[in-house]
Amino acid sequence: MYIIGGKIVTMEGDVWENGYICIENGKIKELGPVEGKAPVPALVEKFSSGKNEVIDASGCIVMPGLIEAHCHMGITEEKKGMEGDDCNETVEPITPYLRAVDAVNPMDAAFDDAVRAGITSAMIGPGSSNVVGGSFVFVKTHGRSIDRLIVKNP
């Protein structure tokens, strides 16, 4: 698969106004600036030879996914009010037995918001009002099953 024509921003700080990314087997194989100033339709034709899928990213910024290092996404649910709030357990000041993985609702609208904002993974934890609030879980943000979203669950 090729992503072409967008503004490519790399982790190393390189920026190409008209760049391309080659992805094979889910991994970035190659990336760089498009040589010359060929119009995107001509590039699509060039890159789409064979079985290559081509995404025209003209007018878009293409960059690595962002990581949310600390949040309560899916625990303090958007639009649910108190019924969807599993964030803070107020019965004790120390609650190390709480596990975020048990409270996260991957159907929460916050997951869709995160994906649209470029956040590809997040460290989600229980409340912030307790001295010890429980254990966090590190998840991908795209998907609907918590079991499939988990990257690391201590």
Question: What are the language-model segments listed below?
Answer:
Residues 1-47:
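N-terminal metal-binding scaffold of metallo-dependent hydrolase/deaminase domains
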Residues 2, 52-56:
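Conserved beta-strand scaffold positions in the cores of enzyme catalytic domains, especially
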Residues 16, 93, 132-134, 152:
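Short, solvent-exposed loop/turn segments at the edges of secondary structure
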Residues 20-22, 123, 131, 136-138:
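Short beta-strand scaffold segments in enzyme catalytic cores
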Residues 22-27, 130, 142-145:
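Short acidic-glycine loop/turn motifs at beta-strand connectors
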Residues 44, 137-154:
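Metal-coordinating catalytic core of metallo-dependent amide/deamination hydrolases
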Residues 48-50, 118:
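Short, structured coil segments at secondary-structure junctions
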Residues 60-126, 130:
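Metal-associated gating/positioning segment near the N- to mid-region
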